[in-house]
A protein has these predicted regions:
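N-terminal accessory targeting/assembly segments
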Residues: 1-96
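Conserved nucleotide-binding/hydrolysis micro-motifs of P-loop NTPases
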Residues: 49, 59-61, 75-76, 93-96, ...
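P-loop NTPase nucleotide-binding/switch module
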Residues: 67-69, 83, 96-144, 158-163, ...
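P-loop NTPase nucleotide-binding module
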Residues: 130-182, 225
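Phosphate-binding/switch loop-helix module in NTP-utilizing enzymes
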Residues: 137, 217-253
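Conserved catalytic network of the ASCE P-loop NTPase/AAA+ motor domain
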Residues: 139-141, 166-171, 195-200, 230-235, ...
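Nucleotide-state-sensitive switch-loop elements of NTP-binding domains
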Residues: 170-173, 183-230, 258-276
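Conserved catalytic/coupling modules of large nucleotide/cofactor-utilizing molecular machines
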Residues: 230, 248, 258-456
C-alpha cells in the first residue's frame, strides 16, 4: 500500500479492548482490520461521519489517545489449503506451533454468507464414533451437528479428545479442531496426543484461548470454519469440525457487547445472542461436494439447561448428548445421560427397526429403574416384586455395559482404551435385555468393550 492510498486515523478513546478512532480521509468498512502500533482492531460500528468503534483482537498495552491507526482495507484473512494440515494457528491464521511459516497460496476472508438452502443436502447417514452410549442411544449424523452438553468437570473435553482419536484412525476426511476460550494446557495436551496417534497430518488446529482478548475468542470460530469450507467446496472432502467450547463463544460475544455499550437482555447476555450463534452455526452444513460434521462441547453454567446460551445452542443440534454429574459421581464414564440424550437420527427409517427397538427398550428399562429408586431407598430391594427386581438387575447391568475405557484416559486409569462397533454394542445391549447376563456380577460388565469380555 503506497502512502497516497494510506488511510490513517487516530485513536480518540481506549476502554479496555474497545477502541474509538477518527478517520478524516475515508471511513473504514465494517469488519475491516485496523492496525494501531502492535494492536489489531476490528471495526464493528460507525459512530458518525468520521468515527468508528472497534474491538481489539490483540492486547492493547501501550495504546493511548492520539496514537496513529492505519486501515488495512480488508477483514481478517486466513490461509486455506492443504499446506495447513498438521499445523496450529491463531485467529489471524498465523502459525503458533514454532514449526515455521506456512506457504499458503490462497487467503480468504473469515466472513461468508451461509450456503443457500437449495444447495444444501440432507444425507441421513449415521456417523459411527466407536462409543457405545452415543452410537446406540444418540447416534450422530454425517453432516450434522452434535452437542456435548454438561456442567464443569463432567467430561466434555475428554469425550471430544476421544472422538478425535477414534475418528482419526478410520475417518477418511480432514479434522479441524477449534479451541474457543478453553485452557491452554488442554490445547497443548491435545496437540501432543493427536501427534502420538499419528493423526496430526490430517488435522488443523485453531486456538483463541482463555487468556486472549474477547474479540479473538469471538472470531476464531469463523476462522476455523473458513478453513473447513475450503476442504468441503474446493477439495470436495468431508470435514470433521470439533469446537470446544460454544459457550465460550457466546461469553466472548457478551463481553464485546458489554464493552460496546449495548444493553444486556436475559441473564445479562447480549441482545444479539441468537443472531451471532446462527451466523456461526448456519455455515456448518453439507453440500453436494462434501459434508462438514460438527461435534461441539457446550458448557452448561451451574448445570442450568434453561440458560439462554444453552437453549439457543440446542436449537441448532441434530444430536444432543447430555453429560450427567450424577453419573460422573457414580464413576459411570462416559457420563452420558441415556434418558436426556436425544438424536433425530434415532428413527426406524434411518437406523432400522432392530436398533430403534433396542434403544427404546434400554430407555424404558432405565426409566422404570429411575421410578423404583425411591422405593428401593425406603424399603430395600427385597421388597420389590420379582418382575421389578428383574428390571433393576437389567438396568444396573445396562448402565455398567454402557461405560467404556478411553484411550485418552489410559495413563490415568491403567485400562486399555476400547473402540466398539455399533453391531457389537447393540448385540451386548440386546443380550442384557434378554437376561443372558443376570447370573454374572455387575462389575464384570463395567469398563469393557464387547459383551463377550464379561465372560472372561
Amino acid at each position: 500500500m503506497n502512502d497516497s492510498n494510506l488511510n490513517q486515523g487516530e485513536v480518540i478513546s481506549v476502554r479496555g479492548s474497545v477502541i474509538d478512532a477518527r478517520f478524516i480521509k475515508r471511513l473504514p468498512k465494517i469488519h475491516n482490520l485496523l492496525k494501531a502500533g502492535g494492536a489489531m482492531i476490528e471495526v464493528l460500528i460507525h459512530l458518525g461521519a468520521e468515527t468508528v468503534r472497534g474491538v481489539a483482537l490483540t492486547p492493547t498495552q501501550g495504546l493511548a489517545r492520539g496514537s496513529p491507526v492505519i486501515d488495512t482495507g480488508r477483514p481478517i484473512m486466513v490461509p486455506v489449503g492443504e499446506k495447513l494440515l498438521g499445523r496450529v494457528f491463531n485467529v489471524f491464521g498465523s502459525p503458533i506451533d514454532n514449526q515455521g511459516k506456512v506457504e499458503a497460496k490462497e487467503f480468504r476472508s473469515i466472513y461468508k454468507e451461509p450456503i443457500a438452502l437449495s444447495q444444501q443436502t440432507n444425507i441421513s447417514e449415521i456417523f459411527e464414533t466407536g462409543i457405545k452410549a452415543i452410537d446406540v442411544l444418540a447416534p450422530m449424523e454425517r453432516g450434522g451437528k452434535a452437542g456435548l452438553l454438561g456442567g464443569a468437570g463432567v467430561g466434555k473435553t475428554v469425550l471430544i479428545m476421544e472422538l478425535i482419536q477414534n475418528m482419526a484412525g478410520k475417518y477418511e476426511g480432514i479434522s479441524i479442531f477449534c479451541g474457543i476460550g478453553e485452557r491452554c494446557r488442554e490445547g497443548e495436551e491435545l496437540y501432543r496426543e493427536i501427534k502420538e496417534v499419528g493423526a496430526l497430518e490430517k488435522t488443523i488446529m485453531v486456538f483463541a484461548q482463555m487468556n486472549e482478548q474477547p474479540g479473538a475468542r469471538f472470531r476464531v470460530g469463523h476462522a476455523a470454519l473458513t478453513m473447513a469450507e475450503y476442504f468441503r467446496d474446493e477439495v470436495r472432502q468431508d470435514v470433521l469440525m470439533l469446537i470446544d467450547n460454544v459457550f465460550r463463544f457466546v461469553q466472548a460475544g457478551s463481553e464485546v457487547s458489554g464493552l460496546m455499550g449495548q444493553l444486556p437482555s436475559r441473564v445479562g447476555y447480549q441482545p444479539t445472542l441468537a443472531t451471532e450463534l446462527a451466523e456461526l452455526e448456519e455455515r456448518i452444513c453439507s453440500t453436494g461436494s462434501g459434508a462438514i460434521t460438527s461435534v461441539q462441547a457446550v458448557y452448561v453454567p451451574a448445570d442450568d439447561f434453561t440458560d439462554p446460551a444453552v437453549v439457543h445452542a440446542f436449537g441448532h443440534l441434530s444430536s444432543s448428548i447430555v453429560l450427567s454429574r450424577k453419573m460422573a459421581s457414580q464413576g459411570l464414564y462416559p457420563s452420558i445421560d441415556p434418558l436426556q440424550s436425544r438424536s433425530k437420527m434415532l428413527s426406524p427409517l434411518v437406523v432400522g427397526d432392530r436398533h430403534y427397538r433396542i434403544a427404546q427398550m434400554i430407555r424404558k428399562t432405565l426409566m422404570e429403574y429411575e421410578e423404583l429408586k425411591d422405593i428401593i431407598a425406603m424399603l430395600g430391594l427385597e421388597e420389590l416384586s420379582q418382575e421389578d427386581q428383574k428390571i433393576v438387575n437389567r438396568a444396573r447391568r445396562l448402565e455398567r455395559f454402557l461405560t467404556q475405557p478411553f484411550s485418552t484416559t489410559e495413563h490415568f486409569t491403567g485400562l486399555e482404551g476400547k473402540m466398539v462397533k455399533l453391531e457389537d454394542a447393540l448385540d451386548g445391549c440386546e443380550r442384557i435385555l434378554k437376561d443372558e447376563f443376570s447370573e454374572y456380577p455387575e462389575k464384570s460388565l463395567y469398563m469393557i468393550g464387547k459383551i463377550d469380555e464379561a465372560m472372561k
